[in-house]
Amino acid sequence: MCFLPFCTIFVFFALANHNIIQMKKLLFLVLFVATAMMGQAQVSKMLGQWNTFDDKTGDMRSTVNIYEENGTYQCVITTLYEKDANGKFQVMKAPYPKGFEGVVGTQLFSEMKVDGDQLKGRVYDPESQKTYYGKVTYKEKTDELILRGSLDKAGLLGRSQTWKRKK
């Protein structure tokens, strides 16, 4: 993102008006808009298909699709995986084994909204069939999502999973 237009406006305003209070107000506005735009850019990188992994075993569990709809972010399970005889992951096909029926198509996010450079809302755990407070953070260096589900809003009592972008 280029901040040159913002800086140019600020310098022009500062030279045209030597009023310090107005310059401070403009600087605050420029920084506020720039921060909001950077957070939105981070969140847009979360959209798309992601492979999920069991936080205890590290095994690939599913592919999910994250998308924006009516100002909130949704996440639906699109594919389940299982290990074959050689230990490689393959797509689990219907009819699904007991306990996996109805999992494909399950919505994992509810009330997920942008909060800075994260998504915050509620996350559903199909395994426990419970809903928790949820937070999603994008790690740009590794192109991964960190999903934190917790009993408390602060995220102290819970667990995290790392999701990797589907290639």
Regions from the PLM with identified roles:
Residues E144, L151-K167:
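Edge beta-strand at a domain terminus
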Residues H18-L26:
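Positively charged n-region of N-terminal signal peptides that target proteins for export
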Residues M38-Q49:
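N-terminal helix-cap/turn-to-beta initiation motif at the start of protein domains
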Residues T52-D54, D59-E127, T131-Y133:
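Central antiparallel beta-sheet cores of small beta-barrel/beta-sandwich binding domains
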Residues V11-A16:
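Acidic, Ala/Val/Gly-enriched low-complexity intrinsically disordered segments
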Residues L26-T35:
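Sec-dependent N-terminal signal peptides
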Residues G134-K135, E140-L147, S160:
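Short, compact, well-ordered microdomains
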